[in-house]
Amino acid sequence: ELALLVASESTPEVIKSISKNRRNELIKAKSKENFIEIKQVYNALQQAYKTAFSTKVKLKVFDHIHGSREVEMTPMDSIRYHAMLLQTGLIAIDPHNGYVKCWNGGLDFDYFKYDHVTSRRSIGSTAKPFLYTVAMTEKGIKPCDEFQDIPYSILPGEANFKNKEPWNPQNATKINTTLMYNLYHGLLYSKNSITVKLLKEIGSVEPLRDLLDKLGISKNEKLPNGRLAVPQLPSIALGAVDISLLQLTAAYATFANNGIYTVPVLIKRIKDKEGKVIYEAKQQVTKAIDPLYNAIMLDMLINNETGEFSMHLK
């Protein structure tokens, strides 16, 4: 809090009036009298900042049409205004060669320097198609096989799972219908219960981690805090992994490329001033998913959009 005593060019005059030496004396003070004086100064600073943030001034704010526009509002209102803007990123990748066609990290770099394409976050239910793929390839589960929509748990010591506490996920609606769902419907309605049941059938998270690794999401990559980006925990089946939109999009592009993962390419080639090619990207591919199961999974994803089953399943 005492850091507020440090003035800047934009600090109100009442704050600037406190000399640097006097601020240092107050910070070092230990007596009760000086503490009271510090508190008085602190309260004065709080009031000064409150006044400054509540006073209308001319400033520039982001504008969707013109990029920016001048307005007269309080600094606090400008914060509220920018907080109301939808922040998102967009990336488009050609699934056949990995060429990045579009990269939009946010609204405007001048105002928002946070890149939503490279920033990491939990991916939620977008992880489910990967788990469904593993269930089919590793355990031979068929898309027509049905499972009941009831609560499922994974307990410590169960099968080859490594969770130390019981894992009892719920559906997003917190309701279980007790009805039977095949894989198509389980994915269509994004049933957490069906996903957990499939994971229990697999008996370990390692096959899922292995698939993600083939899809460019390294199972051994560690975050700055030392944790694995793809933990060895059952919760990864429901998207508890920290990856970027770039990684997720490249992984999904595999479904549109007959199960072949292609490393994203940002730069195709570089030429020197004389036109000589000094760098040319080489396509890096991995056969990640069996073509048959990839075709089934692709059909499920298309069904999620159209609501129709091309394989005539009911």
What do the PLM-derived regions correspond to, one by one?
Residues N97-G98, R120-D149, G186, A251-F255, ...:
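Active-site SXXK
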Residues I141-L208, Y261, K273-L298, I302-N303:
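Conserved catalytic neighborhood of penicillin-recognizing serine enzymes
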Residues A92, S119-A127, I175, L179, ...:
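Secondary-structure capping and boundary motifs in well-ordered enzyme cores
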Residues E1-D94, W103-N104, F109-V117, A127, ...:
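A penicillin-recognizing enzyme superfamily signal
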Residues F161-P169, I202-A250, G259, V263-L266:
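Mid-domain, small-residue-enriched loop/turn segments at the edges of structured enzyme/sensor domains
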